[in-house]
Curated annotation (Swiss-Prot):
InterPro entries: DiS_bond_form_DsbB/BdbC, Disulphide_bond_form_DsbB, DsbB, DsbB-like_sf. Gene3D superfamilies: DsbB-like (1.20.1550.10). It comes from Xanthomonas oryzae pv. oryzae (strain KACC10331 / KXO85). It is a multi-pass membrane protein. One of its GO terms (molecular function) is protein-disulfide reductase activity. HAMAP family: DsbB. It holds the Pfam family DsbB. The keyword Cell membrane applies. Required for disulfide bond formation in some periplasmic proteins. Acts by oxidizing the DsbA protein. Keywords: Cell inner membrane, Cell membrane, Chaperone, Disulfide bond, Electron transport, Membrane, Oxidoreductase, Redox-active center, Transmembrane, Transmembrane helix, Transport. Belongs to the DsbB family. Disulfide bonds join 38-41, 104-131. This is Disulfide bond formation protein B.
């Protein structure tokens, strides 16, 4: 069973399940392994959640029209692209020399209570302290690096599903 030959609905369902699994693992790492997320981690989670929503809506809708499938593909690609941008910033913060680090700033909850949304976004993206810590690795890659890998893969998956016409036994 080649997943690239699956129906749009099945491919978008798989994309949703991948995002849900990644978010579940992030919560597991936080609650059971004690790794608190930094503000950039939280923004990456939001990007994965947005991507999951687009995948789920696309899977539930299962449009027959090629144009509608393309819209879902592009929306999902944009959500993944935002996640890639945040992930790239996070990786950059992690690879900077430690002597160039500054504080990541106050917690996100405090920022959101005292600033507008655009100021919070700008402040979080300029934070570097805790965001630069590497507390977890798998196969030599940090969690933000793995997020980048997943965002790239899911972006390509969304475009592949949205821009290829296909009919299969898994259609509905």
């Amino acid at each position: 069973m080649n997943p690239f030959r699956w129906s749009f609905r099945a491919q978008f369902l798989l994309g949703f399940l991948a995002c849900a699994g990644l978010l579940a693992y992030a919560i597991y790492v936080q609650l059971h392994l004690g790794l608190e997320p930094c503000p950039l981690c939280i923004f990456q989670r939001i990007a994965f959640a947005a991507l999951a929503v687009f995948f789920l809506i696309g899977a539930l809708h299962g449009p027959r029209a090629a144009g509608a499938r393309k819209v879902y593909g592009v929306l999902s690609f944009i959500a993944a692209g935002v996640g890639m941008g945040i992930g790239a910033r996070h990786v950059w913060v992690q690879i900077r020399p430690k002597d160039m680090m500054s504080s990541c700033g106050p917690p996100l909850s405090f920022l959101s209570e005292t600033m507008g949304p655009f100021e919070v976004f700008r402040t979080v993206l300029t934070g570097t302290g805790d965001c630069g810590n590497i507390d977890w690795r798998f196969l030599g890659l940090s969690m933000p690096m793995w997020s980048m890998v997943w965002f790239v893969g899911l972006a390509l998956w969304a475009l592949s599903a949205g821009f290829k016409a296909r009919r299969s036994s898994l259609h509905h």
